[in-house]
Amino acid sequence: MAKRGFNCLLLSISEIDLPVKRLESPNKTRRPYGASIY
């Protein structure tokens, strides 16, 4: 049950974080923020 909230949190974080990371390092692989965790 807590996993759903955790996924929502990750999603909101990645939505903010991904564009920033793309601007900082476009050379790196464009992976979702939570992909490294699972």
From Swiss-Prot:
GO cellular component: cytoplasm; extracellular region; mitochondrion
Disulfide pattern: none
Record keywords, A-Z: Apoptosis, Cytoplasm, Mitochondrion, Secreted
GO BP: apoptotic process; cellular response to amyloid-beta; negative regulation of apoptotic process; negative regulation of neuron apoptotic process
Induction: Repressed by estrogen in anterior pituitary cells. Induced by estrogen and progesterone in astrocytes. Induced by growth hormone and Igf1 in Leydig cells at 10 and 40 days old but not at 60 days.
Location of this chain's protein in the cell: Mitochondrion; Secreted; Cytoplasm
Tissues in which the UniProt entry reports expression: In the testis, expressed in Leydig cells at 10, 20 and 60 days of age (at protein level). Also expressed in pachytene spermatocytes at day 20 and in vessels, peritubular cells and spermatids at day 60. Not detected in Sertoli cells (at protein level). In the adult ovary, expressed in stromal cells, granulosa cells, theca cells and oocytes at diestrus and proestrus (at protein level). Expressed in the anterior pituitary where it is detected in lactotropes and somatotropes with lower levels in females than males (at protein level).
Record Pfam families: Humanin
Function: Plays a role as a neuroprotective factor. Protects against neuronal cell death induced by amyloid-beta peptides. Also protects against excitotoxic cell death. Prevents amyloid-beta peptide-induced spatial learning and memory impairments, protects against amyloid-beta peptide-induced suppression of hippocampal long-term potentiation, and inhibits amyloid-beta peptide-induced activation of STAT3 and inhibition of CASP3. Prevents glutamate-induced dendritic atrophy in hippocampal neurons and also prevents glutamate-induced decrease in SYP puncta number and total puncta area.
Protein name, per record: Humanin-like protein
Native source species: Rattus norvegicus
